[in-house]
């Protein structure tokens, strides 16, 4: 086994060496153009960009252009920035162009390294995104490096959260766009919620170069980006209003089909609804949100049964009953607003829920780019994850000068108190001799504690944490000055170099002190890497205690045994040993493994949504950008809806099937009383489908004629499809989230939660597609066509507008007609506010 591990390590090392030899040869070829480029005038050098673009358009690949293009950037950087990329920077630039990660130590000039692949890939005209962790770095790098790109004839944009859609679109249309990772993600999601192509801001995702790639693609991998809208009290009141109306209906006012669990309003029911909500036409396209509330109220009152489908517990919560076990299903809620409708029916508080309109994880966001690369000083420890998840290799790049930093062995103390006392003593000693010190902590609380102790010890210092991040760059820039003491959480200040002040080299350079080991070796290495940049002298020292989180979770028992063997029992004993360091790193590897497994599992779940999201977003794009009549698509939806409904009814007897089909058709396709049993008695299933489809087509044609011109027909079709798709997709996202929570418990029953999730999510997706087609069909058949068809910005806005239009009408009517006599204090208030009577009109 040991021999096998040794062989694997030797193989990896040899592969790295072979890769470096290849990169050196390529860098030498770039260097061979140096004299030629130096001889060019500014105008001739700048003209190279147009030449490269023409050659690319004529068939040369970016790989063919690499050597000359990199040489042009080197010479341009020398003239514009006064910087001339070293060979190791050129090597790193080649790795970046190949779609991999060069591991370059702190201070090796990653920002300058990036200019070469960014320039080269921008020549394609398809856009390059330089991704940073915060807007300060985006603005700084775009400003500094933008001088070079602009001089070479490329446009540079900065995408900031505060910018308008127009400004964002201009930024994304530039050759090179600087942005934070989160803003790219949110822009992508928002682009897939718009209803006009001209409202989109992004181009297709081409090439991303991610700075601090480990932070974004590893540490934040599990963080989902979510665009959501809260359901307010007005929305909740609409559930009660719809319930109030539905409870007043008679059996003639609705058409119910028990076998398929579908229900809809009859003509008399529609009349009552229009009168109740003061609407001209319930099935006007503008009122799609209202029909949603009514449909759910109908289902809640006439299909869902107390003690069979659900019950209300002592806390006044509606609990779903599992039809197979008869037990309540903890944490599960009906989707699509049905649960809230049942809450309104039962007179219990309607729970506010924020509706997720769109979401994506960074893992799936960045995997959509045609090419992805990134820079970090500490990526090798996560190489497996980069390779498995993103298909990216990590290539260690040699430093331009040998590393002179001294990394001391860890010091272990029996308690936190003794550890912190030792840290303060070390900091004070170094401060008194003038050596700058950077103290790294894992948490803000630790920063504050050490700050208090340093104040007590009379050591002036700066504290950098989440409370004062706006001064981050300034504090870090001064951290290398003589006598400077800086306390920072481990991740703070990344991307800003710490340069040594006058006389500091002679004092040993910057000393980095870690107050505990992080879960990840990579974070520890990042902290160490703040010292010893570009061959500068420096030191690093980690202080540990048996009471540290990492030690308590993984290492303390073994180390206690080790201490006992060495007879180290005194309270103030300290251990300094290579064996200790190995034990700590072993604990870190286990945590890293656990975290990787967790991120991998998140990806397995999210991959299911990714596939579904891509289908929905692609269909949305087709609708938004369509410059044609969408009648074939809508008619196909109508046909499939009819086929599904007829097939579902034919599961029973033909007599019952025909009754159900007539109810379905009257509620959703044609006028009431236009069909009878005699129409279908002599037909088989296929003939019934054809008959209904022919009748539906006649209704469709009559609806379209009302729109008069082709442009208005297309606009109406897009309004219809986008409204329905967005509403159903939003509900589906919530349903998937609930499913994920539910299947996670099934692992205890020896079932694979991932497999169960994939299977049920697939079924739910098909059900959603069926629901979309059903709703498009129903609205197409029943909508009142009028002259001012116009797409809303989002379906959420349409919903909000509908609610606001109705509420003023309703509140006045309710106050006029409501009686409060005989209402118990704990009963729901008759005003339909959703509150108990004692907290509303019964308040004394």
Curated annotation (Swiss-Prot):
May bind 1 zinc ion per subunit. PROSITE patterns: SECA, SECA_MOTOR_DEAD. ATP binds at residues 89, 107-111, 497. CDD domains: DEXDc_SecA, SF2_C_secA. It is found in: Cell membrane; Cytoplasm. It comes from the Bacteria. It is a peripheral membrane protein. It is an enzyme of class 7 (translocase). Its cofactor is Zn(2+). The keyword Protein transport applies. One of its GO terms (molecular function) is ATP binding. Zn(2+) binds at residues 829, 831, 840-841. GO terms for cellular component: cell envelope Sec protein transport complex; cytosol; plasma membrane. Its EC number is 7.4.2.8. Pfam families: P-loop_SecA (PF21090), SEC-C (PF02810), SecA_DEAD (PF07517), SecA_PP_bind (PF01043), SecA_SW (PF07516). Keywords: ATP-binding, Cell membrane, Cytoplasm, Membrane, Metal-binding, Nucleotide-binding, Protein transport, Translocase, Translocation, Transport, Zinc. It catalyses: ATP + H2O + cellular proteinSide 1 = ADP + phosphate + cellular proteinSide 2. GO terms for biological process: intracellular protein transmembrane transport; protein import; protein targeting; protein transport by the Sec complex. The keyword Iron-sulfur does not apply. HAMAP family: SecA. Belongs to the SecA family. Part of the Sec protein translocase complex. Interacts with the SecYEG preprotein conducting channel. Has a central role in coupling the hydrolysis of ATP to the transfer of proteins into and across the cell membrane, serving as an ATP-driven molecular motor driving the stepwise translocation of polypeptide chains across the membrane. Monomer and homodimer. Part of the essential Sec protein translocation apparatus which comprises SecA, SecYEG and auxiliary proteins SecDF. Other proteins may also be involved. This is Protein translocase subunit SecA. It comes from Streptococcus suis (strain 05ZYH33). The lineage of its organism: Bacteria, Bacillati, Bacillota, Bacilli, Lactobacillales.
């Amino acid at each position: 086994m040991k021999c096998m591990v040794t062989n694997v390590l030797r193989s990896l090392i040899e592969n790295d060496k072979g890769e470096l030899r290849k990169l050196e040869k390529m860098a030498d070829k770039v260097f061979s153009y140096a004299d030629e480029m130096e001889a060019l005038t500014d105008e001739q050098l700048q003209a190279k960009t147009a030449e490269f673009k023409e050659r690319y358009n004529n068939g040369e690949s970016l790989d063919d252009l690499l050597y000359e293009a990199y040489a042009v950037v080197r010479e341009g950087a020398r003239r514009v920035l006064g910087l001339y990329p070293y060979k190791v920077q050129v090597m790193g630039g080649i790795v970046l162009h190949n779609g991999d990660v060069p591991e370059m130590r702190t201070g090796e000039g990653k920002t300058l390294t990036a200019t070469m692949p960014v320039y080269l890939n921008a020549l394609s005209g398809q856009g390059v995104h330089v991704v940073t962790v915060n807007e300060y770095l985006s603005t700084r790098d775009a400003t500094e490096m933008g001088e070079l790109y602009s001089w070479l004839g490329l446009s540079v944009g900065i995408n900031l959260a505060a910018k308008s859609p127009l400004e964002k679109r201009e930024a994304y249309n530039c050759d090179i766009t600087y942005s934070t990772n989160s803003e790219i993600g949110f822009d992508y999601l928002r682009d897939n919620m718009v209803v006009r192509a001209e409202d989109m801001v992004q181009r297709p995702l081409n090439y991303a170069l991610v700075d601090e790639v480990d932070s974004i693609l590893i540490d934040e991998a599990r963080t989902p980006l979510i665009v959501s809208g809260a359901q307010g009290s007005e929305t909740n009141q609409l559930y009660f209003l719809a319930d109030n109306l539905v409870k007043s209906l008679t059996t003639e006012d609705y058409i119910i089909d028990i076998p398929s669990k579908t229900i809809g309003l009859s003509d008399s029911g529609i009349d009552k609804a229009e009168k109740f909500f003061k609407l001209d036409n319930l099935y006007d396209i503008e009122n799609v949100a209202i029909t949603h509330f009514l449909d759910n109220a109908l289902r809640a009152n006439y299909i869902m049964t107390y003690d069979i489908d659900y019950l209300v517990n002592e806390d006044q919560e509606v609990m779903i009953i599992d039809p197979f076990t008869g037990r309540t299903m903890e944490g599960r809620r009906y989707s699509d607003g049905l649960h809230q409708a049942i809450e309104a029916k039962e007179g219990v508080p309607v729970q506010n829920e924020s509706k997720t309109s769109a979401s994506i994880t960074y893992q799936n966001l960045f995997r959509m780019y045609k090419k992805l690369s990134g820079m970090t000083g500490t990526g090798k420890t996560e190489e497996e994850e980069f390779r498995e998840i993103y298909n990216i290799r990590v290539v260690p790049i040699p430093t331009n000068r040998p590393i002179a930093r001294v990394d001391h062995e860890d010091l272990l103390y029996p308690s936190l108190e003794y550890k912190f006392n030792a840290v303060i003593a070390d900091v004070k000693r170094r401060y008194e001799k003038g050596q700058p010190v950077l103290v790294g902590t894992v948490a803000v609380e630790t920063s504050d504690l050490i700050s208090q102790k340093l104040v007590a010890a009379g050591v002036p210092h700066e504290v950098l944490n989440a409370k004062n991040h706006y001064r981050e760059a300034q504090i870090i820039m001064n951290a290398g000055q003589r006598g400077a003491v800086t306390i920072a959480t481990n991740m703070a200040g990344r991307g800003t170099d710490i340069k040594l002040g006058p006389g500091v080299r002679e004092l040993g350079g910057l000393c980095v002190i870690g107050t505990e080991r992080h879960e990840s070796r990579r974070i520890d290495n990042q902290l160490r890497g703040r010292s010893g940049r570009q061959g500068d002298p420096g030191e690093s020292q980690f202080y540990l205690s048996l009471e540290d989180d990492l030690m308590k979770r993984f290492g303390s028992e073994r180390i206690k045994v080790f201490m006992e063997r060495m007879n180290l029992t005194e309270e103030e004993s300290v251990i300094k040993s290579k064996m200790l360091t190995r034990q700590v790193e072993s604990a870190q590897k286990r945590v890293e493994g656990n975290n990787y497994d967790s991120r991998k599992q998140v990806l397995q779940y999210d991959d299911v949504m990714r596939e579904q999201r891509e289908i929905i977003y692609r269909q949305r794009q087709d609708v938004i950008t369509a410059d044609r009549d969408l009648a074939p698509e809508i008619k196909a939806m109508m046909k499939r809806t009819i086929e599904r409904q007829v097939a579902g009814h034919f599961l029973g007897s033909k007599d019952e099937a025909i009754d159900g089909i007539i109810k379905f058709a009257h509620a959703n396709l044609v006028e009431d009383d236009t069909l009878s049993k005699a129409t279908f008695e002599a037909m088989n299933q296929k003939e019934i489908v054809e008959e209904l489809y022919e009748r539906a087509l006649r209704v469709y044609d009559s609806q379209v004629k009302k729109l008069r011109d082709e442009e208005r027909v297309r606009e109406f079709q897009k309004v219809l499809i986008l409204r329905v798709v967005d509403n159903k997709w939003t509900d589906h996202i919530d349903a998937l989230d609930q499913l994920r929570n539910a299947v996670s418990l099934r692992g205890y029953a020896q079932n694979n939660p991932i497999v169960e999730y994939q299977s049920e999510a697939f079924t739910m997706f098909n059900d959603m597609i069926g629901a979309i087609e059903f709703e498009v069909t129903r609205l197409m058949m029943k909508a009142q066509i009028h002259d001012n068809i116009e797409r809303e910005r989002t379906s959420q806005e349409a919903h909000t507008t509908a609610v606001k239009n109705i509420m003023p009408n309703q509140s006045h009517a309710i106050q006029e007609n409501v009686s409060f006599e005989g209402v118990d204090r704990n009963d729901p208030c008759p005003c339909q506010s959703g509150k108990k009577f004692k907290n509303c009109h019964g308040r004394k």
